[in-house]
Design a protein with these regions (language model features):
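A short mid-domain helix/strand-loop element embedded in enzyme catalytic domains
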Residues: 139
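Contiguous, glycine/small-aliphatic-enriched amphipathic segments in soluble metabolic enzymes
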Residues: 1-119, 123, 127-135, 143-145, ...
Length: 311
């Protein structure tokens, strides 16, 4: 079985974060399902290895090109000095079928401008034909998405497509949290398109009563603070961003928390699972069944057996 090549961008990582990355990737369970390619830690890898207590030899392979990556090894690539250069290089490698996934490991100081810049950077490099990119935040089993009143309906449509592809949900259910009651009609009209969207709900009641549990995703319409409240409510120690609507799977670890091995492993497994879901979806919908009737034929013809057939 071909192993997926996972590009990890770690240019902004400090020494302790690099140590965590190497320790997590050295796990045999990770190396059996993917081939990690890490950029940004080539200058500190020797000192990091000296600090790690090694019971067995860590399989490190230093490379200068993605195509030289070896399965069963932690491939440290020495080619890019900044985060933006690494992302461009990884995206270019994806276009050449040499990288399957990208995971961005930002610095400890991270904000929405960084996330917007990441999406813009990828859009500049990719010719995107998979729809509008949406930046999700995932914590545990809860998916959240920030939106505005102007783009709410379009974002719900894009989110519906994204969860069908990436989460194999046939009819994903969406809850909209917001104060604009006039959007109720627009949300209800989506159900005529067989999109299961409901709301808008009042934020305090929705979160306090845990009304989010039956839904597959929650969209916060101009309710940034309420979104943060919900994420804090369901926090299980691993919160990360995931960008849908791109031809490749891109995840971004939340830089506001200290990186742990379990967090990195969860994001890697999530990315691989999402990639496999996309492959299954495209395989199932690539060649739809053709109609089994002749458009110009008549289905109201009646055979009269009392008449003789003229030759």
């Amino acid at each position: 079985m071909k192993l997926l090549k996972v590009g990890l961008v770690a240019n902004a990582a400090n020494g302790s974060t690099c140590e965590t990355i190497i320790s997590a990737l050295a796990n045999q369970d990770i190396l059996e399902v993917c081939t990690p390619i890490v950029s940004g830690i080539q200058d500190s890898i020797d000192s990091v290895l000296a600090n790690i207590e090694q019971e067995v030899q860590i399989p490190i392979c230093k490379i200068s090109r993605v195509e030289d990556a070896l399965d069963g090894k932690i491939n440290i690539i020495d080619c890019c000095n900044t985060e933006s250069e690494s992302i461009r290089y990884m995206v270019s490698s994806f276009l050449n079928n040499m990288v399957d996934l990208i995971i961005d490991l930002p610095s400890e100081i991270c904000n929405s401008k960084d996330e917007t810049a990441l999406i813009s950077l990828i859009n500049e490099t990719l010719s995107n034909e998979d729809g509008k990119p949406l930046n999700w935040t995932i914590s545990g089993n809860v998916r959240t998405l920030l939106t505005t009143g102007d783009t709410l309906v379009d974002d719900i449509r894009e989110a519906h497509i994204a969860l069908r592809k990436d989460a194999t949900l046939i009819k994903p259910r969406f809850a909209v949290v917001g104060k604009d009651d006039t959007s109720h009609g627009n949300i209800a009209s989506l159900r005529e398109e067989k999109i299961m969207a409901f709301g808008p709900f009042e934020a305090d009641t929705f979160i306090n009563a845990k009304h989010y549990l039956p839904y597959d995703a929650v969209l916060f319409c101009d309710e940034d603070s309420a979104c943060q409240r919900l994420l804090a409510e369901v926090d299980e120690g691993c919160s990360f961003e995931y960008i849908s609507g791109l031809p490749l799977v891109v995840t971004r670890l939340n830089g506001k928390a200290d990186l742990t091995q379990s967090m990195l492993k969860e994001v890697i497994y999530f990315s691989i699972h999402t990639h496999r879901n996309r492959v299954r979806y495209h395989g199932a919908t690539k060649h739809p069944l053709e109609r089994q009737w002749i458009p110009r034929g008549r289905d109201d013809f009646k055979l009269d057996l009392t008449k003789e057939v003229s030759e």
